Amino acid sequence: RSTWRAEARNGRGPAETLARVNRALCQDIHTGAFVTLLYAVLDPETRQLDLSSAGHPLPLLHNDGTVQEIEIYGLPLGLKSDATYQKVHCTLSPGDTLLLYTDGVTESLNLSRELFGLERLIKLVQEHDNCVAAPLIQRVLATARAYSGRAGQADDATVVVLKTCPRTVPSPGHRSSAPRPS
């Protein structure tokens, strides 16, 4: 974590940060051990989003009733010291929902050893597109837990949801140029 914090504060983009953290981890990590993560940097005013992935599940973007995966790939950290990471840049639209999750959600198994899977997750996001972030997170986690039932979850399940405001909201201190009534 210390390496990650130090590198993330240097202001490099997500891809370069992952490459630098990966090189450091490859020197310190046990053979066969690895770390997955997704690094996202958002400019809240412009809704510009830069993403880089180190073996993490693909993020989901819900926009205008459709859910699509943001295709971004990279090796998990700690596997290959000269691994390179790509950066994907996108602009979020007003009302978009970005869902980040660990494989503990989609790889939840029921008693018949069937995966919860990506299709169920996408359907869940579509069905709850009007939810604010916290209830959507709770719904996804509760549904994955319920799917596992008595089998229990074998892996950690984490969900992060980012929802953009449906319309532009002025930033604090922004002054409107509209004339004042006299």
How would you name each of these model-derived features?
Residues 1-182:
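Conserved subregion of the PPM/PP2C metallophosphatase catalytic domain
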